[in-house]
């Protein structure tokens, strides 16, 4: 079924397919759904709230509240639809709900204030009631559109506000009498003040008139004296101007006379100067004539000699330049040769140094490799190097030469008898060699103090000697 709400109504739809409540102006309502139409137009609620002040004085607060749902807030409409819409907005349930909220907040607020505070601060009291009631109505989705709180009235049997009004009326009447008396007093005082001020102002005006008259007379006298003084000053100034003009005229006449005399002297001197200049030019022309004549006589001969000397000097200069260039070229070539030799020597030394560095690096690598091979045994490394470099052979040669020079008696060690030939003879030679080795090693140790390598064996009674290095 398709339902449409009126302008002041909403559709509250619940049921399958709707999580909570769906609000709409028009919608399809299916059989498995429920639809409630609620009106959102505001309603006037009239109350006479009975409350009690902090002094336990009762009073009645007549009020008219215009209350309705908050149509501009969907959450407030949902609250209203959930809590209020099941009841008629004009029903006793809604009326009692609103009345209970208003009475409760009004009584709580009135209990915290005295009657004097409530009566004098009626506007603030009404505002506090309005704010607190609105705060409570928010939880029902309601809003106060208008609140008209009337004048506080007494509860039957209590005449507090009547007495308070009478007190106010009496105070107003007394204040009016006081104001009238003060007005009369101010009027009489003002009249006397006006009369005194009139007399004072008249005397003041008379005195000021006399003062102004005297001032005017004095100003007239001063102006007359001032005019006379200015006339005298003007006359003196004009006389000074005439004297100054006469002096300037005399000075100009003297200057003109001086200029005329100077002009006459300058004209005379200019004539003499011009005469001297012309005489000088005549003498110069005579000298030039004689010079040209002498040039004609001697210039040709001098020119020939000059040209000859110049050519000879140029030739000598050319020869000296060429000799100097040859010497310079030879020196440059010698310097270049010396530089090339120095570069070659430097390059040779550089390469030799690089070779030594490379050899040292290779030997270092070689020694590190050997040392790692013998497990850091320096004795084995030393023996290997001596054997590899033929040190023992050199020692043997040196000892043989020394023995030969000494011509010692040679002892031959032979162990065991002779046996048959073949492989037996070869084994006999090897056995004899091994038998002769210990005496040889003993002899070497006695003469040089050097022990045989560890892989050959050790000597009995051989003690390592301490080598003292200085």
From Swiss-Prot:
Quote a single Gene Ontology cellular component term. plasma membrane raft
Keywords in alphabetical order: Cell membrane, Coiled coil, Lipoprotein, Membrane, Palmitate
Q: Give the transmembrane region(s).
A: none
> Taking the first listed entry, what is the main subcellular location of this protein, grouped into a coarse class?
membrane
Q: Which Pfam families match?
A: Band_7 (PF01145)
The biological processes this protein is annotated with in GO are:
cellular response to hypoxia; endocytosis; membrane invagination
Q: Where in the cell is it found?
A: Cell membrane; Membrane, Caveola
Which ranges of the sequence are coiled-coil?
Answer: 305-354
State the family named in the UniProt similarity comment for this chain. Answer: Belongs to the band 7/mec-2 family. Flotillin subfamily.
Q: What does this protein do?
A: May act as a scaffolding protein within caveolar membranes, functionally participating in formation of caveolae or caveolae-like vesicles.
Tell me the protein's name.
Flotillin-like protein 1
Identify the species of origin.
Arabidopsis thaliana (Mouse-ear cress)
Q: Which gene encodes it?
A: FLOT1
């Amino acid at each position: 079924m398709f339902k449409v709400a009126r302008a002041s109504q909403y559709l509250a739809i619940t049921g399958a397919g709707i999580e909570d409540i769906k609000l709409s102006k028009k919608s399809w309502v299916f059989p498995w759904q429920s639809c409630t139409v609620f009106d959102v137009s505001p309603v006037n609620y009239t109350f006479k709230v009975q409350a009690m002040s902090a002094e336990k004085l009762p009073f009645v607060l007549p009020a008219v509240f215009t209350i309705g749902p908050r149509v501009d807030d969907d959450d407030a409409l949902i609250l209203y639809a959930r809590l209020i819409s099941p009841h008629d907005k004009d029903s006793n349930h809604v009326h009692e709900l609103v009345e209970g909220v208003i009475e409760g907040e009004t009584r709580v607020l009135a209990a915290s204030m005295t009657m004097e505070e409530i009566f004098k601060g009626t506007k603030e009291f009404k505002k506090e009631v309005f704010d607190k009631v609105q705060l409570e109505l928010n939880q029902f989705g309601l809003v106060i559109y208008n609140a008209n709180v009337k004048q506080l009235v007494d509860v039957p049997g209590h005449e507090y506000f009547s007495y308070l009004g009478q007190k106010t009326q009496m105070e107003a009447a007394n204040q009016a009498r006081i104001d009238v008396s003060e007005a009369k007093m101010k009027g009489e005082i003002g009249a006397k003040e006006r009369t005194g001020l009139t007399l004072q102002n008249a005397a003041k005006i008379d005195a000021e008139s006399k003062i102004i008259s005297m001032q005017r007379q004095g100003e007239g006298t001063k102006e007359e004296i001032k005019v006379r003084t200015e006339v005298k000053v003007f006359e003196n100034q004009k006389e000074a101007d005439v004297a100054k003009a006469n002096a300037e005229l005399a000075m100009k006449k003297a200057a003109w006379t001086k200029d005329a005399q100077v002009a006459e002297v300058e004209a005379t001197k200019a004539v003499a100067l011009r005469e001297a200049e012309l005489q000088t030019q005549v003498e110069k022309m005579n000298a030039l004539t004689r010079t040209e004549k002498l040039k004609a006589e001697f210039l040709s001969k001098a020119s020939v000699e000059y040209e000859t000397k110049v050519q000879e000097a140029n030739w000598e200069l050319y020869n000296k330049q060429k000799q100097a260039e040859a010497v310079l070229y030879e020196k440059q070539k010698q310097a270049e040769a010396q530089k090339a030799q120095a570069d070659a020597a430097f390059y040779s030394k550089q390469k030799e140094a690089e070779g030594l560095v490379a050899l040292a690096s290779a030997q270092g690598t070689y020694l590190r490799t050997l040392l790692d091979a013998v497990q850091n045994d320096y004795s084995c490394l030393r023996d290997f190097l001596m054997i590899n470099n033929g040190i023992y052979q050199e020692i043997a040669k040196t000892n043989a030469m020394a023995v030969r020079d000494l011509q010692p008696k040679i002892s031959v060690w032979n162990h065991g008898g002779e046996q048959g030939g073949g492989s037996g003879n070869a084994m006999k030679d090897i056995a004899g060699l091994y038998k002769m080795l210990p005496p040889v090693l003993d002899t070497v140790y006695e003469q040089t103090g050097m022990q045989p390598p560890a892989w050959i064996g050790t000597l009995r009674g051989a003690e390592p000697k301490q080598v003292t290095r200085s």
